[in-house]
Regions:
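A generic structural signal for well-ordered coil/turn residues at beta-strand boundaries
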Residues: 2-4, 26-28, 54-56, 147-149, ...
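Small-residue-enriched alpha-helical segments and adjacent helix-cap loops
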Residues: 73, 77-79, 93, 111, ...
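Alpha/propeptide regions of enzymes that mature by internal proteolysis
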Residues: 1-4, 10-13, 27, 38, ...
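Extended amphipathic alpha-helical scaffolds
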Residues: 1-46, 147, 246-388
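Mobile "lid/hinge" segments at catalytic clefts and subdomain interfaces of large enzymes
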Residues: 143-277
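Short glycine/serine/threonine-rich phosphate/pyrophosphate-binding segments
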Residues: 25, 124-130, 147, 172, ...
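Glycine-rich, flexible beta-strand/loop modules in the N-terminal catalytic cores of phosphate-handling
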Residues: 26-112, 116-123, 189, 194-206, ...
Length: 410
């Protein structure tokens, strides 16, 4: 098997993709590099669908290897441990923009594994892995609506910098990861934005740096499209060099368009009325009532198409809500796109803890509890990063009663 590669300049960074050298048994295998950071990304999809699968079984794993940073794992056994928080977040970052890009009805079990082989502590591996995963899926012949490209945009000294190094990020006020896909017109559609202020944001703004206003952030997103397009073109260039197999993948149809059309004709106006109810509980109850009526009306006892009816009904509800927002400018609870929920907060709820507060936004509540400790209680970190401890720890719990449901506590 020949080795093929392609390189692309993204700002000051050079990103290289190579295939045909490592993991030759994986249908989609890509080694991606930037600086001295190297990641192997493999993609494998089964050719058949498991019995009883009614969802798309996509898994993304990020494997950080301690040797990539020249370290030996801690602990008695000196073995690689469980995934770090950073690796878990990288998995989610890869999953979010890629999952919607698969063709509707594709249910074959698909696995993406990103193994960090080397890190230079200047070029982060997450964006590299995301782009390589998109490329690997194409090399494996998996049915995608479009390739996906992604970049990190950082607001440094009042200018947007693409793929900034970790040294440059120390002066950043605002960072965001922007992912996009190519639409039929050849333009970039943004499919994901993950953004947030940096640890140095307040200090930098106090020193005179521009705050990330809505217009500034919009400019950064718009600027990212050029680089996303270049990454997608690089992926296409490498795919064109390879003999990508044409596979007749099984595509599952959840429901027929005829069934959806019949349900829409019979219950479309009632669904529109139900979605205009601003009270959440009342709206949910009315939606369930209409769904039961749809099942009763269109049930085929010989085929038992209950599931198909419910999925078609759900699709109609989704389209109704979307159309209502786009055409009428009203969301489910009656707010316009620019309105926010009522916000309030209380403090000192609990008598013996160091600090407590209750934050409310609409019907959403968050109870926060703070505990202060000595510096020796810092969390020790055994990761590939240069940071070896963490003094601020934020634990998030989401019990089932938060959404009025009952299921096992994990």
């Amino acid at each position: 098997m020949s080795i093929d590669n392609v390189k692309v300049d993204i700002g000051k960074a050079e990103i290289g993709f190579e295939t045909g050298k490592l993991a030759l048994q994986a249908p989609g295998s890509v080694v991606v590099t930037s600086g001295d950071t190297t990641v192997l990304v493999t993609t494998v999809a089964n050719k058949s669908v498991r019995d009883g699968i009614d969802f798309f079984p996509l898994t993304v794993d990020v494997e950080e290897r301690m040797y990539s940073a020249g370290k030996i794992p801690g602990g008695f056994f000196r073995r690689e441990g469980r995934q770090t928080e950073k690796a878990i977040l990288a998995c989610r970052l890869i999953d979010r923009p890629l999952r919607p890009s698969f063709k509707d009805g594709f249910r074959c079990e698909t696995q993406i594994i990103a193994t960090v082989l080397s890190v230079d502590n200047e070029n982060e591996y997450d964006i590299l892995a995301l782009n390589a995963a998109s490329l690997g899926l194409q090399l494996a012949g998996v049915p995608l609506e479009s390739a996906v490209g992604a970049v990190r945009m950082s607001l440094i000294n009042d200018n947007w910098v693409v793929q900034a190094t970790n040294s440059e990020l120390e002066d950043s006020v605002f960072d965001m990861v922007v992912a996009g896909s190519l639409n039929p017109k050849g333009e970039i559609d943004i499919v994901m934005v993950e953004a947030g202020a940096t640890d140095n944001a307040f200090a930098k703004i106090d020193e005179g740096s521009a705050a990330p206003t809505e217009n500034i952030v919009a400019d950064g997103i718009d600027m990212s499209k050029e680089f996303i397009s270049k990454l997608i073109e690089a992926q296409k260039e490498l795919v064109a060099k390879r003999d990508v197999p044409e596979i007749d993948w099984p595509i599952i149809e959840d429901y027929s368009e005829e069934l959806k059309s019949q349900i829409s004709e019979a219950f479309g106006s009632d669904i529109e009325t139900a979605m205009a109810i601003t009270d959440r509980a009342e709206r949910s109850e009315k939606q369930s009532e209409l769904q039961e009526q749809a099942v009763e009306k269109f049930l085929d006892e010989e085929e038992d198409n209950t599931k198909a009816i419910k999925l078609a009904f759900k699709s109609i509800v989704k389209n109704t809500v979307r159309d209502r927002v786009l055409s009428g400018g009203a969301r489910l609870d009656g707010r316009t796109p620019t309105d926010i929920r009522n916000i309030s907060a209380e403090i000192n709820l609990l008598p013996t803890v160091h600090g407590s507060s209750l934050f409310l936004r609409g019907e959403t509540q968050v109870l926060n509890v703070t505990t202060l400790g000595m510096s020796r209680l810092e969390q020790m970190l055994d990761t590939i990063d240069t940071v070896t401890s963490k003094r601020y720890m934020h634990h998030y719990n989401f019990p089932p009663y938060s959404t009025g449901e009952a299921y096992p506590m994990r």
